[in-house]
Amino acid sequence: VESKAKDFTLQYDWCAGSMPPPHHYEYTIRIGPGLEGEIVFHPDYPGLGAPEWTEPFDVAEEPLDALYALVKEQVLSREWVKVEDGTVGGSLEWMSGTADGQHFQVPSRVEEEEALEPVYAAIKALVPEAVWAKLRARREQYERDYDAG
């Protein structure tokens, strides 16, 4: 396995489709430099007094190397073309980062989207299950509090 580049950094954004508050949520996962990661979670539309929760986490070297290899193979090898399909509603995901001295940017809704599925799955898998569980619980509590209003 080739060692990951020293300059490997990545930011992945996921955003739920349009829904009335408090059911919308979005999050950003940042990886690198090195074995550091964090997830920033918005349990509602950002701004307007909605909270923002940040959870740092450690990234294990092996899955990070695997992600780096995937990014080199699946992401750096293509020109990403945004599809203007006019779709309204569904969730969106996009990412940007640096690998091998190359900056890359993948917009939401692109051609060859299926090539990104293993990359996005690997990014989400770097966040420990305990962190996801904590954020899910906080989000459910936020929705209950919102509904209790």
Residue ranges of each PLM-predicted region?
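Short, well-ordered, aromatic-rich surface patches in folded extracellular/luminal domains
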Residues: 1-19, 77-149
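Short glycine/serine/proline-enriched coil/turn segments at secondary-structure junctions
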Residues: 18-22, 47
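Short, surface-exposed coil-to-beta transition loops
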Residues: 21-27, 52, 88-92
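Residue-level detector of buried hydrophobic side-chain packing
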Residues: 29-31, 67, 95
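Short, solvent-exposed coil/turn segments at beta-strand boundaries
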Residues: 30-37, 100
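Acidic/histidine-rich, surface-exposed loop or edge segments in extracytoplasmic proteins
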Residues: 37-54
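Second-shell loop/turn segments in exported
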Residues: 53-57, 106-109
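Charged, amphipathic alpha-helical segments
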Residues: 60-84
